[in-house]
Amino acid sequence: DRKIIGWDEILEGGLSPEATVMSWRGTSGGISAALQKHDVIMTPGSGGLYLDHYQGDYKIEPVTIPSAPAYLSRTYNYEPVPDTIKSLGLEKHILGVQCNNWSEYMYTNAKMEYQMYPRSLALAEIAWSPAKKKNFTDFARRVDANSVRLDERHVRYHIPLPEQPYGSCDKVVITKDTVVTFQTSRPMKMVYTLDGTTPTPASAVYTEPIKVSGNMTIKIATVLPSGKMSKVRTIDVEKQNYAPAVNVSDTKAGLQLRRIKGNYLKVNQLDFADAEWQDCGTVTNLNKMKVSQPDDAATLRGANNYGAIAEGFINVPEDGVYYLSSRMEQVWIDNKLVINNEGAVKAGTNSDNAVALAKGLHPVKFVYLCNIVGGWPSWWSNLNLEMRKDNQKKFTSVQGTQYFHK
């Protein structure tokens, strides 16, 4: 006999007596269904059970659906049977646990496997092991030691990358002697070089923050017990003076905006477009660079393609080294290209940069292309510019009151 299994939205319309509920929007749906004596499969994204979510710092991981990191530890530490269900003796209604792996941004089988392993191994253990028997430290040791079994079967899998606290970036700008700190999402050996050569398992072992005083290149990777290494990260360290502000008088609020119709995949195509640029006034909110799309744009049909440029000045509040992040096609400051996402899937960004800026006004230009790359419509992206001083922990969006034009 057939029996219905449905996502937890079916709770909203009343359940047939034999319906099984898949609780994906947290655990509340599963608890509610079990209280009604319905069987449940637990699969909440909040429990690290969506394998298409990032498993490391999204600023250096391959692009996938925008999401908070679902580290291996998060998946492993998920407990499928909520305490509420245990206290009521309704454990029998929790049939099991499931991971999901949506594939919109998995363009190859290798990428699919990379997202699945080793978190699918954690899924097996949380499904079969009593909570009191679980030990993440021991699990991680076994995963790392037995990765050779995956290698023998030519299975791609995730090896945690060396990450920087508060957001990884392949460019580090300094104005004085400092240190560069790295960490991994679980305890792992890291090796590095400072002479431009590619590190090997026998290279210097990272044991403390790396001292930097001038221009140099850090190459760093993690190493498994087998000697297999992660992708090597290359971090360019550059000593800069604060770029001077410009002296501009009689400025007005906002950036000057212009648009041009057409389907553009490269910024230089704007220079050879047949259409004419249209003056669109001024904007203080960068999302206003976008235009409203037809109702069926969510299905990726009927979109109005165009390019847009907003330019003027940005007011930097104080001297400092600033880390920059944006999903714009390009961002220019002081007539220098500081962020370049050209051709990238804008679901995420691996193009963060850093620059030393003096307090005051600096020329700025934002380039936006309304197109679809890798299945991601660029109009889904938030077009803000985020900045973080090197002594701050969080990025914040630049406020509209910081933009000016002549």
Which residue stretches match the model-derived regions?
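Active-site neighborhood of glycoside hydrolase catalytic domains
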Residues: D1-S32, Q36-K37
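Active-site beta-loop-alpha junctions enriched in small/polar residues
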Residues: E9-L11, W24-G26, G45-G47, N100-E104
